[in-house]
């Protein structure tokens, strides 16, 4: 069993934005999002999710256009179909798009749907577009373009329509604590940084024609981000806004109240100095952010629980 990398590509800025939205959709907006640990960029497809043990793959093709016709959708499915007929098994095949024409859906209120919500006439046009595009691709064998394969493939495809702003996708990263960041410009800046980091993975090395024998070998080419990478980047940018300018956090008041009033200012200044030193100490920055990530994750888990102890 093997997999040959074909049709990797460089993406325009608009396409990169859609791919980042797709990444954050995989990471935060699915019932199985917690299973996905790696986000592999432009290797199997535009984006592919992988679990920690490389047992499961979630395949994503993205297209930012808003009014995709049924036939256009069919053509966009070609790389997903390529992976459907390959030796590797994928858990899900996702077409992430900016929008579809009003002739596609039975229920236009559903923005995540399978073939059961596509009109019969649109299904036929999707098949026509897929067959036409598949026949033009050298990486798909004519013998694989059969009615049986296409019907089985379409039964497994999920179409997801992008219905959120970049800032809304970033909010899903800090779910459980929505008031952590309120400024739209901060959220947009975080999204752009995730987008740029994701896009930079395409430039690491040429992989066209690479052959791998197992799914986990894809990680050796370093074209991936992890869920922790994205969460930590987000947390760093939030903390680095200006953690000192806003004064003493309410949650810190019980600790401050144990200090003699005449020492308040000195104590606060000492804490702020220590925080600044930790933030900008390059020798221990990795350990600091790893600790802070764990503290933050525990805070999200226990955010709704009453405080039992005062430190």
Q: Which residues make up each language-model segment?
A:
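Acidic metal-coordinating catalytic centers involved in nucleic-acid phosphodiester chemistry
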Residues: 1-12, 64-300, 304, 308
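Catalytic centers of nucleases
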Residues: 9-13, 17-82
